[in-house]
Each structure stands twice: as C-alpha cells, then as structure tokens.
Amino acid sequence: MPPPAPGARLRLLAAAALAGLAVISRGLLSQSLEFNSPADNYTVCEGDNATLSCFIDEHVTRVAWLNRSNILYAGNDRWTSDPRVRLLINTPEEFSILITEVGLGDEGLYTCSFQTRHQPYTTQVYLIVHVPARIVNISSPVTVNEGGNVNLLCLAVGRPEPTVTWRQLRDGFTSEGEILEISDIQRGQAGEYECVTHNGVNSAPDSRRVLVTVNYPPTITDVTSARTALGRAALLRCEAMAVPPADFQWYKDDRLLSSGTAEGLKVQTERTRSMLLFANVSARHYGNYTCRAANRLGASSASMRLLRPGSLENSAPRPPGLLALLSALGWLWWRM
C-alpha cells in the first residue's frame, strides 16, 4: 500500500461544549470517499452543545462538513439554514463547526471532507444524542374496595431506554416494570406508590407518585367503660378504623341516644372515635351501652358499661362463655 499523500493525516475532534468531552478519530483517512473503518462515536446530552473539528494542514485546498448528504459548511460558505449550526474556526490547521442545543434530529453521521492537491479524503463521526429519562404518563389516584384489583401504569421515555421501578412508600415494596398489578388488595397496601425512572444520563432520576385508597368496612378497635359515682362526670369511648370514615351511633339498650339536656349527655365524634359524655351522672344513666360504627361497606358494634362504684359487675364486658367456664371450675374445686 503506498504511503498516504501529504496532508492526508487527519484527526477529528468532537467535543461537548458544556461537558468538555472529546473524541479523536483513530487513524489515517479513507481514500476516495470509501470508508474502511467505522466512524467514531460522539455522545452528547439533549440540549447541550457539540463542537465538530477537523485538524488539517497546509496541503488542504478545500474542506467541508456534511451531515449525511447535506452540506453544512464549505469553507466559509454557509449551506445550512439551521441557525443552530455555525462556523467556529476556519484556519489552515483547523476547520470546526458548532451545533447548539442539540436535539434528537441532530443524531447521525457527520463527515469532514477535504481536498488535497492530489485527491479527496474524508473521515466521519457518528453523533449520538442521549435524552434524560422522564415520566410522560402515570395513573391517576385510585380508590378501590378491599379485595379488588389495581393496575398502576407509569410510562417513561429517554435514550438509552430507561428503567421503571414502582415502590410503595409505606413498607418499601418494589416492582420492576411500567405496570404494577395488585390482586386482592388489602387495607395495609393502601398509601402512596412512587414511580421512579432512570437511564444514567442525569444523576437525578425522575419520579412521580400515585395515591391508592382502599375502602373497607368499620372495625372497632377499642372501647372504654366507666365506673363513676352519682353526680360526677363520666366518659364512654369507642374507636373504629374504616375507609371511608365511619358514622357513629350510641344506644342504651335498644334506644338511640343523641346529645341534649333532656338526656343529660353529649355525643362527641372525631374522625376515628366517638365519646359519650355525661356531665352529671344520675341513677338512670347506669347500665349497658352499645357503640355502632358504620359506613357504606358495613357496620360493627361493641358494648360497654357505666357502673356504680362498688358494683360487683365488671366494667369490661366478658367474652361469651367465660361466666359458664368460671362456674364449672368453681364446682370442680368444691367437689375436690
């Protein structure tokens, strides 16, 4: 193979103006527009600037930058109508152009073509545009009844192809992929779910959240009975968990109670609990009370007592069958 013609040695420098990256071509030129080696790759992030430079010498008579088959610059002559592409340097040693605010449409093959006194030569660089991952669509907030199914969708775009991960913020549960399927959902699975996407282009991933609300019927979690003397204040308390929040009602025997001076009591209800307040306990107030918590999915009830001090009755209701069990144990002890 004959040695390369004078001036045939070329380096192609591709530099990111913002990132300060540089790529230098690997060797000698291909002759007569025949490319015997693959083009160098030059990667830049969307929105950054890219500088493409040909390093030449005094033997070069004509030089041009092309994108695919379109001439961008031939010497000082501008051929492109894109205002983002401009001539940066044109000297006997260097011919450089600048592309500002690089977009996906700029990705592709760029060719530096020049003419020496003997023949034409070219070298190439392939511009790769990376796009940070971002979420373009995500499910709206979801409300479902306990036992139902939920599908959450999170669509992300970016180059390279981004990963998508779903995470439940309450317990850290994670799932890979754009779609998160939850079958037979339970109340403990309610809360915020976060979609996170990343492709390594930016240090910070993109993330968005979806609130999942699980409806379920009331469950009474705590009750408080009282043992109070005549003329003193007393309080009975009932707590229930439910979504939507439960509506509370109080009963004495089978009679629905309400706040009022005639009854001598007051019903005070907050989000998850209700209290029956007695400002001045009288004899007619003693007895059994029932708290009922209900929403559109169901209801739950619990009993409690307001007792006199010194009463032999236990203020806490005993489980069914406990009295019978105690009686049987006492009879066995007496027989021994």
Swiss-Prot record:
SMART domains: IG, IGc2. Disulfide bonds join C54-C112, C154-C195, C238-C291. Glycans are attached at N41, N49, N67, N137, N288. Residues 33-122, 132-217, 218-307 form the Ig-like C2-type domain. SUPFAM superfamilies: Immunoglobulin. GO terms for biological process: motor behavior; neuromuscular process controlling balance. It is found in: Secreted. The keyword Disulfide bond applies. Keywords: Disulfide bond, Glycoprotein, Immunoglobulin domain, Repeat, Secreted, Signal. Residues 1-30 form the signal peptide. Gene3D superfamilies: Immunoglobulins. One of its GO terms (cellular component) is extracellular region. PROSITE patterns: IG_LIKE (PS50835). Belongs to the immunoglobulin superfamily. IgLON family. This is IgLON family member 5. It comes from Homo sapiens (Human).
